[in-house]
Amino acid sequence: MKYENKKDIAIFRGAVYQKHRKEFFDSYFGRTFCDIGDTSKQPSQWKKNFLNKKEQMKYKFIISLEGNDVASNLKWAMNSNSLVLAPKITCETWFMEGTLKPNYHFALIDNDNLTTVIEHFISHPKDALEIINNAHQYVKKFLDKKKEFYIGILVLTKYFYYSGQLDLNKDECKREILELIK
C-alpha cells in the first residue's frame, strides 16, 4: 500500500514490561494520533488486540521501541512503505543499527515530541517519503541471501580464529574460503 493511502496515525503493538516502554505509554496511550497497545499476557491498562504486520502496514507511522534489547519490528518496518518512528537506538545486531542515522533512515522521537513529529510528516509527506526511501536502500543490502551467507562464513571463520578454535595460514584460509564460495 502506498504511503499516501495509509492512515494518518502511528501504530505500535508489543509487550510493555520495561520502564522506558511504560513511560512512553504513560505519555501517549489513548491519544487520537496514535494507536498503541500492550499485547502481553499480563493485565494492563494499555491492553489492545494483537495486529499482524500486514495490519500495521496500513498506518503511515510505525513506532519501533526497543524492549529488553533491539526493537524486533525495526527491520520489517523499515522495509515497509510506512515511516519508522523510533527513539535513539541503543542496541546493535547484525542489522548494524548503530549505523542508522536519525531523521535519515527513521524519524527520531522521544516522550515529548511524538505529536510534533507526526504533524510535521503529515504536513510534509515528501520528507516522510525521502526517509522511507533511505530506509529501503539501507535494508536492501541485507536482502541478498547469498552475500549474507558468505559474510556469515567470514564472521564465523574470524570468531573461530580469534577464539583459538581454528589455526589458519593465509594461503590455506584463502583456499578454503574459495572452496566454500564455489
Regions found by a protein language model. Give the residues of each.
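Phosphate-/polyanion-interacting regions in eukaryotic proteins
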Residues: M1-N52
